[in-house]
Amino acid sequence: MVTALSDVNNTDNYGAGQIQVLEGLEAVRKRPGMYIGSTSERGLHHLVWEIVDNSIDEALAGYANQIEVVIEKDNWIKVTDNGRGIPVDIQEKMGRPAVEVILTVLHAGGKFGGGGYKVSGGLHGVGSSVVNALSQDLEVYVHRNETIYHQAYKKGVPQFDLKEVGTTDKTGTVIRFKADGEIFTETTVYNYETLQQRIRELAFLNKGIQITLRDERDEENVREDSYHYEGGIKSYVELLNENKEPIHDEPIYIHQSKDDIEVEIAIQYNSGYATNLLTYANNIHTYEGGTHEDGFKRALTRVLNSYGLSSKIMKEDKDRLSGEDTREGMTAIISIKHGDPQFEGQTKTKLGNSEVRQVVDKLFSEHFERFLYENPQVARTVVEKGIMAARARVAAKKAREVTRRKSALDVASLPGKLADCSSKSPEECEIFLVEGDSAGGSTKSGRDSRTQAILPLRGKILNVEKARLDRILNNNEIRQMITAFGTGIGGDFDLAKARYHKIVIMTDADVDGAHIRTLLLTFFYRFMRPLIEAGYVYIAQPPLYKLTQGKQKYYVYNDRELDKLKSELNPTPKWSIARYKGLGEMNADQLWETTMNPEHRALLQVKLEDAIEADQTFEMLMGDVVENRRQFIEDNAVYANLDF
């Protein structure tokens, strides 16, 4: 068992004077969504990240190297670190111990004054007080000054004054809390995998820190994972490229600071065609990119072109590579730490600090240029790969023009098979990608033509994992999708131009249907990933069975549901079961009622919880290495629904 308290630690003047107070907690319980995004399962897990982020802040400041997260019985969460321990002396303005102020006053914390932490994570600094306000119970133990201090709270209200409960030779903080079921009405049960994925990501992003996750809810089956990466994001890139063929053995790695901005970049090219670029600012995944990404891309393109021309690999200036060309087959991670990050964009996941662009550009270009001149063989391979990508880009240009839709209102350029909806408001519009023309006919007849568009897809689309953009854009089904969506593709992609905010994959419930679904998801992940990140991609859930008893009809979506229904129904009158092999077997009314009607249907939203897992899965299922795919199928066949 790991204990995350520290034996010896420098407390470095981290005291009550550095805890600033901005405002009270009154609004948090009334409008929790404003502070944690939602009160769904996602918001529940966000509580854990707020506490863990405070421990990470201690680590970033150099005072902690062990963090432990435990899911206890009844879904209590315990987070322990071996930092300096939250200050316990009296905070001057409030006249209360600093630890109590941090846990009861909104935006009170070392991260706001500049004197406590140079850099802090904590998504926009919501803080421990919000977790306290939204918890049925919370308790804190502080190991500091050779003393253990303790205080407990209910719904954010202290139950007694901070008290001394023992002596200790360690330093650090332990926080235990149980989310309030009155607030989190959807669920208060934590998902181990969700916590595990983010904890692994945090361990990659903060090299040298050991983060342990343990699940003690089942005494007989305690689960534990511990993550510690001395290589940091360099190890992250190696893991992402695990199923690929790297062009150079070691990732190119830089870790430097300039103007109080810490820049860490790892990059490795592989023989594939897809670009995999992940960016972070203060441990927050910046899905929408930002100035750190801009600076990196600008430097990469400039340096590769300069090297290609000066080394005569590229013959003339007109052979210049575009940014997209230079990133083909690239896996890269950019992580910056900034004292005052400015987040913008639709989901507040785009870095806006203009000064970061120049710092990243300068630091990366100097390092990358040196790498190319010191490794001429690797440099030649990378430049030649870019030249091949440029040729494919030129070939793809005409095909790309064909897919371009001028605006959401531009009907003339729409594909012929598309039955569009009449509404021009993307927020309420949805498009169903339907397997086969016959099912397409039924869905066109059964839809709500005001908000629902139908695009039938004939046969299997191209496996984009094994193809360059020019070949991809020559695939008729892919071209029709790109045109219909209106967003463009790859480097031209613009989420703001999306014609539909729901893209629903609707395939048969058989092996072919699953394959088509995987091909479509691979395409979206590799070339239209922002659609997934924005939550626009869904999978329809057509029924598997129709059970008829007299005049009563029941539509059933899985075997478990069928068994339950059969056990509940009276044996008389006699009932019959029909299994649907395909969407085409249902008439328009049945499709509407079971699969398309927003009042009754079930849709699965496609989420990107774990970039590592997603990337490796697509590479394994759709890539060139047959052995990995065979192993995956053998390992997971037991979980599959087999229909003989």
Curated annotation (Swiss-Prot):
- State any GO CC term: chromosome
- The EC number of this protein is 5.6.2.2
**UniProt xrefs under InterPro entries:** DNA_gyrase_B_C, GyrB, HATPase_C_sf, Ribosomal_Su5_D2-typ_SF, Ribsml_uS5_D2-typ_fold_subgr, Topo_IIA, Topo_IIA-like_dom_sf, Topo_IIA_B
Q: Which UniProt keywords apply?
A: ATP-binding, Cytoplasm, DNA-binding, Isomerase, Magnesium, Metal-binding, Nucleotide-binding, Topoisomerase
What's a BP term from Gene Ontology annotated to this protein? DNA topological change
CDD domains assigned: HATPase_GyrB-like, TopoII_Trans_DNA_gyrase, TOPRIM_TopoIIA_GyrB
Q: What is its main location?
A: cytoplasm
Belongs to which family? Belongs to the type II topoisomerase GyrB family.
Role played: A type II topoisomerase that negatively supercoils closed circular double-stranded (ds) DNA in an ATP-dependent manner to modulate DNA topology and maintain chromosomes in an underwound state. Negative supercoiling favors strand separation, and DNA replication, transcription, recombination and repair, all of which involve strand separation. Also able to catalyze the interconversion of other topological isomers of dsDNA rings, including catenanes and knotted rings. Type II topoisomerases break and join 2 DNA strands simultaneously in an ATP-dependent manner.
Name-wise, this protein is: DNA gyrase subunit B
Q: Which organism is it from?
A: Staphylococcus aureus (strain MRSA252)
The organism's taxonomic lineage, starting at the top: Bacteria, Bacillati, Bacillota, Bacilli, Bacillales
